[in-house]
Amino acid sequence: MAKLRVAYEYTEAEDKSIRLGLFLIISGVVSLFIFGFCWLSPALQDLQATEANCTVLSVQQIGEVFECTFTCGADCRGTSQYPCVQVYVNNSESNSRALLHSDEHQLLTNPKCSYIPPCKRENQKNLESVMNWQQYWKDEIGSQPFTCYFNQHQRPDDVLLHRTHDEIVLLHCFLWPLVTFVVGVLIVVLTICAKSLAVKAEAMKKRKFS
């Protein structure tokens, strides 16, 4: 029995292989929960928005300014200001007036405005960026219809110009944790099976020559 027990002991390489497999299994499960919490839920909410056709009703500054944070080096940060511009549109899904936003991130950052410029140290540069964006929607887009995204249940008074997430995000949320988990399981199973076959082969060899 002692000899049989020794035969079933794993070598250092086999032990490391099993440990690696278990680590990958745990990593796959943990990453699935992390991706599900950080990416999957926001992506599902974003994908619930319905594609619609929007036309511009009005483009105007409302006379309010908001602060943004700029960086000027590794340990250098500061705040500057930008004016608030609002673009109201009519969307084909609800046939109602709604405030346009660049994307979900911009909506959550400043739900009152349609655009947040790249934050610069000088307020004048922020103003110029907003003015250029405002002029684009007045002159280039005008009354031309464009694609927007509308969520009747969550935000009936807002529409998005771009989706932050798409179906690819959902694929990655499931694919990589699943691949990690499956690879871990395969490593553990193949290591155990290989050891079991080696022990059986050794036992048969001993019986043959005994």
Curated annotation (Swiss-Prot):
The chain crosses the membrane at residues 20-40, 168-188. Glycans are attached at residues 53, 90. One of its GO terms (molecular function) is potassium channel regulator activity. One of its GO terms (biological process) is action potential. InterPro entries: K_chnl_Ca-activ_BK_bsu. It is found in: Membrane. It holds the Pfam family CaKB. Its main location: membrane. It is a multi-pass membrane protein. Treatment with okadaic acid reduces its effect on KCNMA1. Resistance to charybdotoxin (CTX) toxin is mediated by the extracellular domain. Interacts with KCNMA1 tetramer. There are probably 4 molecules of KCMNB4 per KCNMA1 tetramer. Interacts with FMR1 (via N-terminus). This is Calcium-activated potassium channel subunit beta-4. It comes from Homo sapiens. The lineage of its organism: Eukaryota, Metazoa, Chordata, Craniata, Vertebrata. The gene is KCNMB4.
